[in-house]
Design a protein with these regions (language model features):
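Residue-level signal for inorganic ion chemistry
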Residues: 39, 85, 146, 177, ...
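N-terminal Rossmann-like NAD(P)+-binding subdomain of aldehyde/semialdehyde dehydrogenases
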Residues: 1-113
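Short, well-ordered beta-strand elements within core beta-sheets of diverse protein domains
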Residues: 26-32, 124, 232-233, 263-266, ...
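Conserved C-terminal structural/oligomerization subdomain of aldehyde/semialdehyde dehydrogenase
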Residues: 329-332, 336-486
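Rossmann-like NAD(P) dinucleotide-binding subdomain of oxidoreductase/dehydrogenase enzymes
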Residues: 105-241, 366
Length: 486
């Protein structure tokens, strides 16, 4: 397929973006309800492209990060995208089927259903940490729902942006799917377009900006944000296993994951044992030479590395104890650092105020499960919560008494990668959800359709009021009120 580029267009990048939006809206108006076959064809084409481009995409991500394992990119960015496309292809017929609903007894002779109608043009704003999966996941949901899609990719992943643009341009016209990257120097302008829905993944601060811009057009938004996702380790759970899994969560993509465990809550008498187990787990996974270890991901750029270093400096100056999982702290040139465990954290430190988004693991001591739950509830509602326990009583209590976007028990992150369940936040960690059927519903308009039976007595609701049938209906359904209430 041919897609125009800014070089081929005489106007500005913003004008080009607005032109594409107009084209997509016109395309949607010409075909507002793509058939099941048409939607499946698009999803099959997308899946084939992901498989074809897997090596090139993984290499592009590696180039943008300076170092990220090709296998890690394939497992986390690409495999998830293929599985999500497969899931949509397999279940789309059922999702598209109108949902029959029961009428009230009074309307029994009529038919009632909910039809799921494409919304129109969907805007997708993608973060840099998983630039492929977090572009293709919403794209799959939007195509399954029958929409047209404009994707705004992050400025700091130019190699991935170019490869995604090329991959999608081969199978989609720009009035179906269009990609924008670093040429849009004012990303806020993207959010002011009158989309029919916006999907944004990023920080709560930017999410609020997106939501304010969308409000000008009354555009509904799905916000996948972040927060400080806790990991609660119970006294009944093997400490070494919990430390291994939490450390893996902090080391994967160097902790640059919105659902990475942000901090660990550990029984106070087990802190030292947990620290040693975490250090041992890190060395087993990556050895002592992460400078030359292709399995360990770099911090994406110098600015983000400095932010992480500044957070550690702030904590140290305020009395925290910092323990690197390896014998050195930073590979400055390669922007790599081992997981750093931080003890004696206090609420005034940046490390306990900000989402860390890097290989830093504060470990907070607790006395009782009551204390741990209270600690979690004292902060904003996180995108994820992790609970390590063999007690169903403890597990159920934590699930009942805490709020989070999703939960994995006895590990981290796995609730996100199953496509038959929704992924989304709550409160400060986001609103709305996608993946699987929930993604289809999120990007569809649920339209209620009532078909009147020709013998339905609509005159029951017409004036003049006070007829025998009206009084009978009122008496039957409302019973008798309390005449003493004045």
């Amino acid at each position: 397929m041919e897609q125009s580029t800014l070089k081929e267009y005489s106007g500005s990048a913003t004008e080009h973006m607005e032109l594409i939006f107009s084209k997509q809206r016109a395309n949607f108006e010409a075909d507002p309800y793509p058939s099941l076959e048409a939607r499946r064809t698009k999803l099959h084409q997308l899946k084939k492209q992901i498989i074809r481009y897997q090596d090139a995409l993984a290499a592009a991500i590696n180039a943008d990060f300076s170092s990220r394992s090709l296998d890690e990119s394939k497992l986390l960015d690409l495999l998830g995208s293929v599985l999500e496309a497969d899931h949509a292809i397999h279940h789309l017929r059922r999702w598209m089927r109108p949902s029959k609903r029961r009428t009230e007894l009074l309307f029994l002779s009529n038919r009632l259903s909910v039809q799921y109608q494409p919304k129109g043009v969907v805007g997708v704003i993608v973060p840099w940490n998983f630039p492929v999966y977090l572009a293709l996941g919403p794209l799959i949901a939007a195509l399954a729902a029958g929409n047209r899609v404009m994707i705004k990719l992050p400025e700091i992943t130019p190699n991935t942006n170019a490869m995604l643009r090329r991959m999608l341009a081969e199978v989609f016209n720009e009035d179906e799917v269009a990609v924008f990257g670093e040429e849009i120097t004012d990303p806020a302008r993207f959010t002011t377009l009158p989309f029919n829905h916006i999907v944004f993944t990023g920080s709560p601060a930017i999410g609020k900006v997106v939501m304010r811009a969308a409000a000008e057009n009354l555009t509904p938004v799905t916000l996948e944000l972040g927060g400080k996702s806790p990991a609660i380790v119970s006294r009944n759970y093997p400490l070494a296993d919990a430390a291994k899994r939490i450390t893996h969560g902090k080391a994967t993509n160097s902790g640059q994951i919105c659902v990475a465990p942000d901090y660990a809550l550990v029984p106070k008498e087990s802190i030292d044992e947990f620290v040693e187990a975490a250090k041992s787990s890190f060395i087993k996974m990556f050895g002592h030479d992460i400078e030359n270890n292709e399995n360990y991901t770099s911090i994406v750029n110098d600015r983000h590395l400095k932010r992480i270093q500044d957070i550690l400096t702030d904590a140290q100056e305020k009395g925290a104890l910092i323990i690197p999982c390896d014998t050195y702290s930073f590979d400055q040139q390669g922007r790599r650092m081992p997981v750093h465990i931080v003890l004696n954290c206090t609420p005034d430190m940046r490390i306990m105020k900000e989402e860390l988004f890097g290989p830093i693991l504060p470990v907070v001591a607790y006395d009782s499960l009551d204390d741990a739950i209270t600690y979690v509830k004292s902060d904003e509602r996180p995108l994820a919560l992790y609970c390590f326990t063999h007690s169903s009583i403890e597990r159920d209590r934590i699930l009942r008494e805490t709020h989070s976007g999703g939960v994995t028990i006895n590990d981290w992150g796995w609730h996100v990668v199953n496509h038959d369940a929704p992924f989304g936040g709550i409160g400060n960690s986001g609103m709305g959800s996608y993946h699987g059927e929930e993604g289809f519903r999120e990007l569809s308009h649920a339209k209620t359709v009532f078909i009147r039976h020709r013998f339905f007595p609509t005159q029951l609701f017409h004036p003049p009021y006070g007829t025998f049938l009206q009084k009978l209906a009122i008496r039957f359904f409302l019973k008798k009120g309390d005449p003493s209430i004045k």
